[in-house]
């Protein structure tokens, strides 16, 4: 569960290392985001030669959460960290590589490019 002020790792090579959730998109009273949800983030830590700079505001999709996610078959999946991938206005990833595993639920939410770039889909 990702809410406002939550800090997340960045799982791509856009140059950002850490981001902070500023807003959860999808309704005026929406408080928490889970895997596959789009959030507005502020870049808190970035590499010097990055595509994004510290202080920039961008959109990101959550790819891993520590909170358990229940699947339709009754199983649960959880990860060791909260991570997101920065995306542009057309929901394509800004980076060209994805680091670490991502959840299968991203494919159903039409983030096929992120799933295809990921080294492992759980």
Swiss-Prot record:
Pfam families: Ribosomal_L14. GO terms for biological process: translation. HAMAP family: Ribosomal_uL14 (MF_01367). PANTHER family: 50S/60S RIBOSOMAL PROTEIN L14/L23, LARGE RIBOSOMAL SUBUNIT PROTEIN UL14M. Belongs to the universal ribosomal protein uL14 family. Binds to 23S rRNA. Forms part of two intersubunit bridges in the 70S ribosome. This is Large ribosomal subunit protein uL14. It comes from Bdellovibrio bacteriovorus (strain ATCC 15356 / DSM 50701 / NCIMB 9529 / HD100). The lineage of its organism: Bacteria, Pseudomonadati, Bdellovibrionota, Bdellovibrionia, Bdellovibrionales. The gene is rplN.
């Amino acid at each position: 569960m990702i809410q406002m002020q939550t800090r997340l790792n960045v799982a791509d090579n856009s140059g950002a290392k850490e981001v902070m959730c500023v807003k959860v998109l999808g309704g005026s009273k929406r408080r928490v985001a889970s895997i596959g949800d789009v959030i507005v983030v502020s870049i808190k830590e970035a590499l010097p030669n990055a595509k994004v700079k510290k202080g920039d505001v961008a959109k990101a999709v959550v790819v891993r959460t520590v909170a358990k996610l229940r699947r339709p078959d009754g199983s649960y999946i959880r990860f060791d960290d909260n991570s997101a991938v920065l995306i542009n206005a057309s929901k394509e990833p800004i980076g060209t590589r994805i680091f670490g595993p991502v959840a299968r639920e991203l494919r159903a939410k039409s983030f096929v490019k992120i799933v295809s770039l990921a080294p492992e889909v759980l």
